[in-house]
Amino acid sequence: MSIISDIYAREVLDSRGNPTVEVELYTEAGAMGRGIVPSGASTGEHEAVELRDGDKSRFMGKGVTKAVDNVNNIIAKEIIGYDVTDQRAIDQAMIDLDGTPNKGKLGANAILGVSLAAARAAADELGQPLYNYLGGFNGHVLPTPMMNVINGGKHANNKVDFQEFMIMPVGAKSVTEAIRMGSETFHNLKNLLNEKGYSTAVGDEGGFAPDLKNNEEPFEILVEAIKNAGYVPGKDVAIAFDCASSEFYNADTKKYELVGDGKEYTAEEFVSLLESIVDKYPVVSIEDPLDENEWEDWQMATERLGKKVQLVGDDLFVTNTDYLAKGIKMGVGNSILIKLNQIGTLTETVEAVEMAKQAGYTAVISHRSGETEDTTIADLVVALNAGQIKTGSMSRGERIAKYNQLMRIEDQLGKTSEYKGIHSFYNLDEDARMAIVNK
């Protein structure tokens, strides 16, 4: 047995300069693991609770000293003495200690910090890379990246309502090549925006946040940038986007209010708008196309779009197996976005990925807009053979850290590694995948 001997938490900063929780966990044998917790800007209302102090005299109320104290004074007393390799028991003990359905007592940020630190300490104790510890000998699939290169919505101050416009190097032969293709497209996009007189300042996730005219212009510019980089839109590099529709949905009027277009849409009209975009551009994935509480509208959208493109539930599912099970039963979406801090433990995260796979849904392992230098998600996506990762643009150190880790892992795995590209979309049939590639 490898016994946990000490746990210590502190307040550090995320990529937005806001406080977050960092946890260090030690074993009797001298192993150590560190976990830093991310945070989101647009959050689903059903997410696990991120405990903040609310003291306006510190960090404008965003301090996390309560969560830190909960680790040091409550969680540590319970978890010290556990076998560090017994991840499921450690996570369950913290869930029981909290005793609430949304981790509102101790804070998901406190619990997740310990969960991540325990996994890293166990890997350190065993002398294994984290992806190898989490996935065993089977973890070998490098993910197709979703690279957020144009920001809108809550991630930027501009007229674009949709939150993220992403490129996916589906035609690459390896993740290293995919990252190169993404970088080249990113830099060609920057040159193109400069030529058009747009700002090339970047948003929270490292993508550009130009003040574009409407919600369609980003697609036009992305296609041009992909071509300028020497690639074929669709065949080499496809497009994904995140509507984050709950952010512009009016629950009283049941309308989607797009400021960039100066229009309001019913659910049916909005899905028709999305259909027109899918028909016109090489789109492979749409995230949160409808409001997180409108399940029947999601059903309608899935019937109309689910055979053509990946439909990812983020705010809809919030990495929660209860919501995912409901979605699977109703035939809602065909993919889940996996964010560790939405649910709060590594164990529950893995359970959500497994449930998705068993139902034929893809699982996209994701960062948050408030990120850190922690690279756990890069190891996790390989460990689980999830096949897709969403971890920001080709700028900002906290995003690049994940890409660098993926390239290290691919290098370590050597010839046993696999990059699936367009075939990572196993939720679409071959005809749908080829339609995107040949668009």
From Swiss-Prot:
<feature type="binding site">
    <location>
        <position position="287"/>
    </location>
    <ligand>
        <name>Mg(2+)</name>
    </ligand>
</feature>
<protein>
    <recommendedName>
        <fullName>Enolase</fullName>
        <ecNumber>4.2.1.11</ecNumber>
    </recommendedName>
</protein>
<feature type="binding site">
    <location>
        <position position="369"/>
    </location>
    <ligand>
        <name>(2R)-2-phosphoglycerate</name>
    </ligand>
</feature>
<feature type="binding site">
    <location>
        <position position="242"/>
    </location>
    <ligand>
        <name>Mg(2+)</name>
    </ligand>
</feature>
<dbReference type="InterPro" id="IPR036849">
    <property type="entry name" value="Enolase-like_C_sf"/>
</dbReference>
<feature type="binding site">
    <location>
        <position position="339"/>
    </location>
    <ligand>
        <name>(2R)-2-phosphoglycerate</name>
    </ligand>
</feature>
<dbReference type="InterPro" id="IPR020809">
    <property type="entry name" value="Enolase_CS"/>
</dbReference>
<feature type="binding site">
    <location>
        <position position="163"/>
    </location>
    <ligand>
        <name>(2R)-2-phosphoglycerate</name>
    </ligand>
</feature>
<feature type="active site" description="Proton acceptor">
    <location>
        <position position="339"/>
    </location>
</feature>
<dbReference type="InterPro" id="IPR000941">
    <property type="entry name" value="Enolase"/>
</dbReference>
<dbReference type="InterPro" id="IPR020810">
    <property type="entry name" value="Enolase_C"/>
</dbReference>
<feature type="binding site">
    <location>
        <position position="368"/>
    </location>
    <ligand>
        <name>(2R)-2-phosphoglycerate</name>
    </ligand>
</feature>
<dbReference type="GO" id="GO:0000015">
    <property type="term" value="C:phosphopyruvate hydratase complex"/>
</dbReference>
<feature type="binding site">
    <location>
        <position position="390"/>
    </location>
    <ligand>
        <name>(2R)-2-phosphoglycerate</name>
    </ligand>
</feature>
<comment type="function">
    <text>Catalyzes the reversible conversion of 2-phosphoglycerate (2-PG) into phosphoenolpyruvate (PEP). It is essential for the degradation of carbohydrates via glycolysis.</text>
</comment>
<comment type="pathway">
    <text>Carbohydrate degradation; glycolysis; pyruvate from D-glyceraldehyde 3-phosphate: step 4/5.</text>
</comment>
<feature type="binding site">
    <location>
        <position position="314"/>
    </location>
    <ligand>
        <name>Mg(2+)</name>
    </ligand>
</feature>
<keyword id="KW-0456">Lyase</keyword>
<feature type="active site" description="Proton donor">
    <location>
        <position position="205"/>
    </location>
</feature>
<keyword id="KW-0964">Secreted</keyword>
<keyword id="KW-0324">Glycolysis</keyword>
<dbReference type="GO" id="GO:0000287">
    <property type="term" value="F:magnesium ion binding"/>
</dbReference>
<keyword id="KW-0963">Cytoplasm</keyword>
<dbReference type="Pfam" id="PF03952">
    <property type="entry name" value="Enolase_N"/>
</dbReference>
<keyword id="KW-0460">Magnesium</keyword>
<comment type="similarity">
    <text>Belongs to the enolase family.</text>
</comment>
<dbReference type="GO" id="GO:0006096">
    <property type="term" value="P:glycolytic process"/>
</dbReference>
<dbReference type="GO" id="GO:0004634">
    <property type="term" value="F:phosphopyruvate hydratase activity"/>
</dbReference>
<dbReference type="GO" id="GO:0009986">
    <property type="term" value="C:cell surface"/>
</dbReference>
<keyword id="KW-0479">Metal-binding</keyword>
<dbReference type="InterPro" id="IPR029017">
    <property type="entry name" value="Enolase-like_N"/>
</dbReference>
<dbReference type="GO" id="GO:0005576">
    <property type="term" value="C:extracellular region"/>
</dbReference>
<dbReference type="Pfam" id="PF00113">
    <property type="entry name" value="Enolase_C"/>
</dbReference>
<dbReference type="InterPro" id="IPR020811">
    <property type="entry name" value="Enolase_N"/>
</dbReference>
